[in-house]
A protein has these predicted regions:
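The feature marks the mature, well-folded catalytic cores of soluble enzymes
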Residues: 1-297
Length: 297
């Protein structure tokens, strides 16, 4: 069995920037303590545990506004790479917290776009994953009733599309193929809609590389946290677009030999929030199973 290491894989620049903000804060003794991250800074528990070793506390939960009530007075609050709504920012200011913003620049771009189009009278159709913090933050830029979340092709066919200017926007970590299908349905219903496909370049490149590699292997392993949207989408695109069985693992201990019983070639990739040492351990485990490594894709 050969192992193909797909590139690019692992941390994107948005994740690197977010972790840099947090670690720099930990080193800066002038910053108020405690330092608290409002939600997981990125969706990977090993990245969160690393911050814990730097003395940074993570408060996690589905409602960022409620999490602020758990932050001690006088603390420093770090906003995660996924972004937050204006209501969260305002509440943090009201409570007097020292706020550090680790929002990914690509996510910030979408926030700005939502604000601009709402000010111009547009209704926003946002394609995203329900319950994920990125859509929650971006959609929070629009007043109630001015934004609609669409998460599936079926919903795209039936969702109410209000009259007047309409702008379609997307979460940055979706499957580019599924998103294209949803956009096609929406624009068929509303040819006048303005489309802004905000899937980030890092997500696109990782998905395209994984699909390309899938055509030449028997199994693809995606290393990523269960909560990582981009990792889960990598599994989906490999199976749906690449036509190859794919498995997501959090660590090397999740690997199952029976997945590779008839496999002669295996490819490994990782989500954009997966630490490289975790991916290396997965590759090392596979190599220990009688593997001859081939060059990177």
């Amino acid at each position: 069995m050969d192992v193909l290491k797909i590139t690019p894989r692992g941390y994107c620049y948005g994740v690197v920037d977010a972790l840099t903000v947090a670690k720099r804060a930990a080193r800066d003794e002038s910053i108020p303590r405690p330092i608290v991250v409002l939600g997981q800074i990125v969706h990977n528990r090993y990245a969160v545990e690393e911050l814990d070793r730097h003395g940074i506390l993570t408060l996690d939960g589905p409602d960022r506004l409620r999490l602020l009530d758990e932050v001690p007075d006088g603390a420093t609050v770090i906003l995660t790479a996924h972004g937050v709504s204006p209501a969260v920012r305002e509440r943090a200011r009201e409570k007097g917290f020292h706020v550090l913003d680790a929002t990914c620049p690509d996510v910030t771009k979408t926030h700005v776009l939502v604000r601009e189009r709402v000010a111009q009278g547009y209704h926003i159709v946002y394609i995203g994953t329900p319950g994920h913090p990125e859509p929650q933050g971006a959609m929070g830029e629009a007043p109630a009733g001015r934004v609609t979340l669409v998460s599936s092709l079926a919903q795209a066919n039936t969702v109410d599309l209000p009259e007047g200017p309409l702008a379609i926007m997307t979460q940055t970590t979706l499957s580019q193929w599924d998103t294209a299908d949803i956009i096609a349905v929406l624009t068929a219903r509303r040819p006048d809609a303005e489309v802004h496909n905000e899937i980030c370049l890092a997500t696109q490149l990782r998905q395209e590389a994984a699909v390309k590699a899938a055509s030449g292997v028997d199994v693809v392993v995606v290393v990523g946290d269960p909560r990582s949207n981009n990792s889960n989408r990598l599994v989906e695109v490999v199976e749906k677009v690449g036509g190859t069985p794919a498995y997501r693992v959090e660590t090397a201990d999740d690997l199952r030999p029976e997945w590779f019983t008839d496999a002669r070639r295996v490819a490994v990739t990782a989500g954009s929030s997966t630490p490289s040492q975790i991916t290396r351990a997965v590759i090392g485990r596979l190599e220990s199973w009688n593997v001859a490594t081939v060059p990177d894709a």
